[in-house]
Amino acid sequence: MSVFVYPGSFDPVTNGHMDIIQRAAKLCDKLVVAVLVNSSKNPVFTLEERVDLLKCAVKGIDNVEIESFSGLLIDFMRKKNSKVIIKGLRAVSDFEYELQMALLNKNLDSDIETLFMMTNINYSFLSSSSVRELARHNGNIDGLVPDCIKDKIMDKFRR
């Protein structure tokens, strides 16, 4: 069984992430979307909220599972018996950072492969931080995030 892992903060999940999830899910038997507990980041949405938002967003994609993890991605990959990391790229600037991470992971485990997927051009401008900024100022996030989570995101910033 082929198991791919798509790691990220997903703070919150966007339609750019969903584009990668939907396309990557077609390439493997199981896609694990791994929500990172990152001590160097200060997420707006709690870990539980990010997992819940993703679970709502991936309903109907049968071979996708949502899990959280902390620590090294390589250790999580071993637990999942996975050899493939999925990374979405919007621009060359994403590639520079992700290439460094891919080389580091390859150095830690030579069997690990990183599969880079270009985001659909319609989402090349989109980031979780831009969604948060729009929501923070009561801007329109229609079409930027899955419909099933739009109100939850806006509610987070109305508090």
From Swiss-Prot:
InterPro entries: Cyt_trans-like (IPR004821), PPAT (IPR001980), Rossmann-like_a/b/a_fold (IPR014729). It comes from the Bacteria. The keyword Transcription regulation does not apply. It is found in: Cytoplasm. The record marks H17 as: Transition state stabilizer. Its main location: cytoplasm. ATP binds at S9, F10, H17, G88, L89, R90, E98, Y123, S124, F125, L126, S127, S128, S129. One of its GO terms (molecular function) is pantetheine-phosphate adenylyltransferase activity. Reversibly transfers an adenylyl group from ATP to 4'-phosphopantetheine, yielding dephospho-CoA (dPCoA) and pyrophosphate. Homohexamer. This is Phosphopantetheine adenylyltransferase. It comes from Acetivibrio thermocellus (strain ATCC 27405 / DSM 1237 / JCM 9322 / NBRC 103400 / NCIMB 10682 / NRRL B-4536 / VPI 7372).
